[in-house]
């Protein structure tokens, strides 16, 4: 459920999207604020719980957010178990790539937060949970559009282009609308091509 009409792309008569994400939260702080408790009141049998963390979990400067990769597993299991207890299907999604090409030796984009991605893949195998590797897919995509193309996806804004950012902005973490649509399209494509088991078949049918 989105407050922005332009963001409603993949909802259908048979699939309602309730976006419970909150900016600046990690798997730890989201839980500590009681947001999982709120989610548990809404989720029901037959639902899917897609979860993506890591950007804030890896931030050692924010004690209330930071978790080690090992603690990351502990927190993700709380979300996984909450979904299962209510007859819903948990789905893990690796964190999208950041615009890091300015910091890599070869100027290429890389998978962000690799230790957390690896842990999520491990959790998927260990507990038989579907994993959508959006982290790798977005890094690969950014390498196709390149340095300049990536600026049109992330919040690289010219001075005066937007009223809310009169001085412009250079943000390598957050997406513009074009980036959000591109990455959502990648996610939808990965769901459509998921063939490890039949756990996502209901969503795949709605995206067909």
Report each predicted region and the residues it spans:
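Acidic/histidine-rich helix-loop elements
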Residues: 1, 19-33, 60-67
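Short, solvent-exposed mixed-charge patches
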Residues: 207-208
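Alpha-helical cap/lid subdomain in secreted, periplasmic
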Residues: 34-177, 181, 185-204
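Serine-esterase "nucleophile elbow" of acetyl-processing enzymes
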Residues: 1-21, 37-45
């Amino acid at each position: 459920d989105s407050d922005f009409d332009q963001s409603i792309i993949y909802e259908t008569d048979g699939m309602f999207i309730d976006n419970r994400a909150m900016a600046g939260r990690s798997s730890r702080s989201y839980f500590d604020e009681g947001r999982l408790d709120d989610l548990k009141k809404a989720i029901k049998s037959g639902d899917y719980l897609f979860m993506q963390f890591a950007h804030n979990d890896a931030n050692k400067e924010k004690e209330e957010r930071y978790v080690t990769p090992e603690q990351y597993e502990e927190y993700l299991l709380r979300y996984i178990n909450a979904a299962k207890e209510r007859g819903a299907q948990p789905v893990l999604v690796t964190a999208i790539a950041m615009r890091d090409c300015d910091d890599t030796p070869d100027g290429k984009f890389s998978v962000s937060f690799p230790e957390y991605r690896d842990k999520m893949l491990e959790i998927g195998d260990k507990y038989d949970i579907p994993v959508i590797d959006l982290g790798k897919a977005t890094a690969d995509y950014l390498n196709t559009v390149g340095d300049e193309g990536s600026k049109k996806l992330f919040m690289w804004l010219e001075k005066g282009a937007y009223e809310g950012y009169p001085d412009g902005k250079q943000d390598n973490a957050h997406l513009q609308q074009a980036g959000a649509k591109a990455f959502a399209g990648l996610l939808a494509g990965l769901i459509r091509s998921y063939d490890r088991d039949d756990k996502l078949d209901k969503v795949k049918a709605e995206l067909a």
